[in-house]
């Protein structure tokens, strides 16, 4: 098994450097690929901000990763929940943080995060702290 850094995963999608894409494809064909939650988080940010890839395309890309036979995603159930919420309009980072909490109650000062989660019908409990 080999672990991918963000730049390898980005190359796999955007295919903007032929030599690097060839290496990434060879790695994918040769071994099981481990993707950490942090790599997924950074990949979403890079693809959204630098490459301006639309949310629907990002959702499809990450959903396909979950279904790929030779890919092992850290905490795949939490990532799957986060992707469901992301598809409903939640921020990917917020959704992933919340999904990773499991049964723990997420506490935050971020009212917008709390409101967006509730509006999207996201089930885990989320509390805004007042100061």
How should each PLM-predicted stretch be described?
Residues 37, 61-87:
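Acidic catalytic patch
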């Amino acid at each position: 098994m080999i672990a991918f850094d963000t730049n390898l995963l980005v190359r796999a999608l955007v295919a903007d450097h032929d030599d690097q894409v060839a290496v990434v494809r060879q790695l994918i064909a040769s071994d099981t690929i481990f993707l950490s939650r942090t790599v997924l988080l950074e990949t979403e940010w890079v693809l959204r901000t630098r490459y301006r890839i639309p949310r629907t395309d990002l959702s499809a890309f990450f959903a396909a990763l979950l279904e790929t036979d030779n890919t092992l995603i850290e905490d795949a159930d939490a990532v799957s929940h986060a992707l469901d919420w992301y598809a409903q309009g939640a921020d990917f980072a917020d959704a992933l943080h919340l999904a990773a909490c499991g049964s723990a109650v997420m506490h935050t000062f971020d009212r917008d995060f709390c409101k967006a989660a509730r509006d999207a019908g996201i089930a885990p409990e989320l509390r805004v702290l007042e100061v």
